[in-house]
Amino acid sequence: MTRSPEAKALGIALGEPWFKLAPRAKEWGLVAKSSNYELYGDISARVMELLGRYSAWLEVYSIDEAFLGVRGNPEELLLLGQAMKTAVRRNVGVPVCVGIAGTKTLAKLANKWAKHNPAFDGVCHWDSVPADRQERLMAGLSVIELWGVSTRLTKRLNALGIHTVLDLARADPVRIRDRFSVVLMRTVLELRGTPCIPLEEERIGRDQLIFSRSFATPISTPAGMRQVLGIYAQQASARLARHGLQAKVLTAFAATSHYNPRDSSHPSVCVSLPMPTADPVLLARAAYALLPRIDDGVKYARAGIMVTDLRPTANQAPLAVFENPHEERGIGPLLEEVSRKYGRGSIGLGHAGIRGGPDWTMKRDMLSPRYTTHWDELPVVKAA
């Protein structure tokens, strides 16, 4: 979640609900739009693909942030940063800022200053900033604005007299490790220019993937829950296949709202699959093991699945005792191909393939067009 410079200038708070802004919408020229995650994801993928052309070392940190490994002197890297910024703006149409430094923590700070200081023109190389100005910039930044420092941690640091980024950079690393953690000690060292946080080129190599969301309208029937689980199984299959992974264990869960303690229910089930798989049918079948534990009439406000014990597809033994013929059917790739061609929700597993958004999905009545992924939402131009 973020705000544009224009929103900040109007004094709009981060996460401020629309109903508070609506009375002044016309005066301020505001237009309400629903979250368009499909468009965001596609634009993000385009940006990351473009950035990957500039370096063999790319870590996609989040939907709107990436780290790249680069080499060169400050002048060369500033030119590279400007080239990346210009290319993303020209080819994708979104503005980006570039922060360059010898450590990831300092690169984050350089990016922040590039974003907020017009003098940098969107690209800041830490080593090109004079030492006295570096200190002034760090002294003017609260420690809570530092990467990985939470509100709770900030309070503990403040109690020790550490209020700014400069204060933390000057702190004794060993004392920080003993009082807090080795993670924060690494941050101190990174602020001093010692690389401690490596570039993670394959962040998907994790232990688990979770697909879960709260419902706009509670689900109170096993049939409704079956649709939810089928959709999540299909999403999990696509994500696993995209990164060349298979799952050995699937956990499905549901929960009522904590605001309704009278009908509290939190069923869950853990299924160990015979073999690691990314097949959507097998994942859905495992998720459906939750259905006998769903109480008819109870209003469930949230559900999801978690796949764990993830393994690279290439590591599967060719002479396994238990063969898995389902992977050869190619159902997952087929679903993805149809979805790419006709749009998300155009095909699915059983009830998950029902056309049109179910009642429980997030309400997005003011959705902007998904120009890059839906043919039927492209603008039409008529020539007279």
Please provide the spans of the model-predicted regions.
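Short acidic, glycine/serine/threonine-rich loops at helix termini
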Residues: 1-4, 106-114, 181, 198-203, ...
